[in-house]
Regions:
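Basic, low-complexity intrinsically disordered segments
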Residues: 1-185, 189-370
């Protein structure tokens, strides 16, 4: 049986980084996400803000003093963060593996047991994931790789931002056991109080305790933590084993008033990427969708249409993976709806999918019936 290879992907300063990726004028500036109220607490801080000593939990009034005259406060945009999150997790499922357990808006576990060898080694796989996420979103992520969930999750926090930490059966005692017991995920405040009484300050102090003392002092949870810190068990990833239901690519624009020819060229490039992904997955599509978002915020968008964007779909008479058919159809849609407004995002997607092999079998069966 192959040893598990579990990755934990954690986006770097996610909320603040989304704001910077969405507005290029914020690049390399101290950006924080919080209510613009001196009594408010910062929810997220960009790495540029952290250079001033600002971090999540810092009061706004203090942050303004630390980055006097430089601090940029964004009040938060949940739709934006969810949009980036969805793009990231869909990308991983479509390009790498469907064995993804989403933990929150900015982190997930990935079971890479059966895919890492394609990349030569685990390091190369992690680099490929980081590159794909950055190319898709302009955001960086840190990845921990190990044979258990706990070690991979702790690893993703060791070399931020944009870092990779691989924890093996050979090095986990060096990388994990030397850390403060406070850094271990799952150790609560009540357990920490008991550990102080036992003079436990590091993971090494804890694992050296007699197992009987651990059972008496911390009960079943302490025994489980003891096992986890020895790399025992804790290696299952909860994922939904579903086939691909849609494939899409989109592009946000940094500048307004782009020429229609440039927009059409970008749309064609997006269509090419969608078709390449379809062909990689041996998939045909029957429905194509154009997604479009405008800079003019006064437009009365239908919020149900995927986060303030307009979508237009058309269905073909037969399944296809033809770049010519897909692009020509969305170009006709674009020509019909475009009236010169500045576009902030454009995308193309396909749904109503079928595997080529299944379609061939289906057509063969229909021919027999006929």
């Amino acid at each position: 049986m192959n040893q598990k290879v579990i990755l934990h992907l954690d986006m770097d300063a996610f909320f603040a980084s989304c704001e910077q990726a969405n507005d290029k004028t914020l690049k390399n500036k101290p950006v924080v996400v919080a209510r613009n109220n001196d009594k408010s607490i910062i929810i997220a801080a960009s790495y540029d803000a952290r250079k001033y000593g600002i971090k999540a939990g810092t009061p706004i009034f203090e942050a303004k003093q630390l980055a006097y005259g430089e601090l940029i406060i964004k009040e938060g945009n949940r739709d934006l963060y969810e949009e980036y999150s969805e793009r990231i997790f869909n990308l991983i499922k479509e390009q790498f593996t469907y064995k993804v357990e989403v933990l929150g808006i900015d982190e997930c576990f990935i079971d890479a047991t059966n895919i890492w060898e394609k990349y030569g080694n685990v390091q190369n796989l992690c680099l490929a994931i980081q590159a794909a996420v950055y190319q898709e979103t302009g955001l960086t992520c840190s990845i921990g790789a190990s044979f258990t969930r706990l070690f991979s999750k702790m690893g993703s926090d060791m070399k931020k931002p944009n870092g990779i930490t691989i924890i093996t059966k050979e090095n986990f005692k060096t990388l994990i056991w030397n850390k403060s017991i406070k850094d271990v995920i799952g150790v609560g405040s009540s357990s920490l109080e008991k550990m102080e009484l036992l003079n436990v300050k590091t993971v090494n102090d804890f694992v050296k305790l007699d197992e009987k003392i651990i059972a008496e002092s911390f009960g079943l949870s302490g025994q489980k933590m003891y096992q986890k810190l020895h790399g025992i068990k804790n290696d299952e990833i909860a994922y939904w084993e579903t086939s691909v239901k849609s494939i899409s690519k989109e592009k946000t624009f940094d500048k307004k008033n782009m020429a229609i020819e440039d927009i059409e060229e970008i749309l064609f490039n997006l269509a090419e990427k969608v078709v390449l992904r379809m062909q990689k997955n041996n998939i045909l599509a029957k429905t194509v969708t154009l997604s479009i978002k405008f800079y003019n915020q006064e437009i009365n968008f239908d919020k149900k249409q995927h986060k303030k964007r307009r979508t237009y779909s058309e269905t073909f008479g037969e399944y296809t993976d033809s770049i010519e058919k897909l692009y020509s159809r969305v170009k006709v849609i674009l020509d019909d709806i475009y009236d010169g407004e500045s576009i902030s995002l454009i995308g193309i997607g396909v749904t109503n999918l079928i595997e080529k092999d299944k379609l061939v079998k289906q057509q063969s069966f229909e021919n027999i019936i006929i």
